[in-house]
């Protein structure tokens, strides 16, 4: 019998990590009562969200709601754990890792952020709204500056899962060459972030 969340493409994700990818470990450090640096937590992240008809899963590794960040009394750790963040925080930061099923394509979207995208496992095609494309492999980095784009997992010619990590930071209002304000849009990704 097929799992209840099996999607039309035959690949499904039931938990993080996605099938075929290794489990990641997040280590959070801090200070002990003597002022020494210590490991406070080692785990797999606080928030996981299924996406794209369960063909992908997002793992929120950390988020901050302000800059500079208040680290006193571990308040930042408490805030990150208590609340699953929106797509991005104004004046904050998010570290998001997404496991993509084979051949999965994100919708075209533009976040009003600066995003550092790092290919952790696999091969991806990064496509801009101009039609320009780049192939990115493990260790390659993209710097998205409020640009419209989508990601396609082409690992194993679209037969294997892949993983990308992003660090999202807020940016000031962006105007294009015509002097018009650039607007963000998430397309079908919006449903995964509404109400947060």
Curated annotation (Swiss-Prot):
- Annotated family: Belongs to the virC family.
Which residues are connected by disulfide bridges in this protein?
none
**How is this protein induced?**
Expression is up-regulated during sexual development. Expression is also up-regulated during confrontation with the arthropod fungivore Drosophila melanogaster.
> What's its EC?
1.-.-.-
Keywords in UniProt for this one?
Oxidoreductase
Q: What does this protein do?
A: Highly reducing polyketide synthase; part of the gene cluster that mediates the biosynthesis of sordarial, a salicylic aldehyde structurally related to the phytotoxin pyriculol. The most interesting aspect of this pathway is formation of an aromatic product from the highly reducing polyketide synthase srdA. SrdA synthesizes a reduced polyketide chain from one molecule of acetyl-CoA and five molecules of malonyl-CoA. The polyketide chain is then reductively released as an aldehyde.
Encoding gene, per UniProt annotation: srdD
Q: Show the segment(s) annotated as Cupin-like domain.
A: 99-165
The answer to whether the entry has keyword Oxidoreductase is yes
Q: What organism is listed for this UniProt entry?
A: Neurospora crassa (strain ATCC 24698 / 74-OR23-1A / CBS 708.71 / DSM 1257 / FGSC 987)
Q: Which SUPFAM superfamilies would you find in this protein's record? A: RmlC-like cupins
Q: What is this protein called?
A: Cupin-domain-containing oxidoreductase srdD
For this UniProt entry, the molecular function terms from Gene Ontology, in alphabetical order, are: oxidoreductase activity
């Amino acid at each position: 019998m097929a799992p209840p969340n099996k999607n039309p493409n035959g690949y499904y994700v039931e938990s993080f990590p996605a099938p075929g990818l290794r489990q990641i470990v997040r280590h959070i450090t801090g200070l002990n009562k003597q002022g020494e640096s210590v490991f406070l937590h080692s785990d797999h992240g606080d928030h996981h969200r299924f996406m794209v008809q369960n063909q992908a899963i997002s793992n929120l590794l950390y988020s901050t709601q302000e800059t500079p960040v208040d680290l006193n009394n571990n308040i930042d750790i408490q805030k990150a754990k208590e609340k699953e963040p929106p797509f991005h925080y104004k004046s904050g930061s998010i570290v998001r890792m997404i496991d993509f099923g084979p051949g999965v394509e994100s919708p075209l979207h533009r976040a009003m952020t600066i995003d550092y995208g790092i290919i952790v496992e696999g091969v991806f095609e990064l496509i801009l709204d101009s039609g320009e494309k780049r192939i990115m492999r493990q260790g390659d980095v993209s710097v998205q500056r409020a640009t419209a784009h989508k990601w396609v997992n082409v690992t194993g010619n679209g037969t294997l899962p892949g993983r990308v990590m992003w660090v999202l930071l807020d940016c000031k209002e962006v105007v294009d060459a015509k002097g018009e304000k650039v607007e963000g849009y998430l397309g079908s990704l919006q449903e995964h972030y509404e109400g947060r």
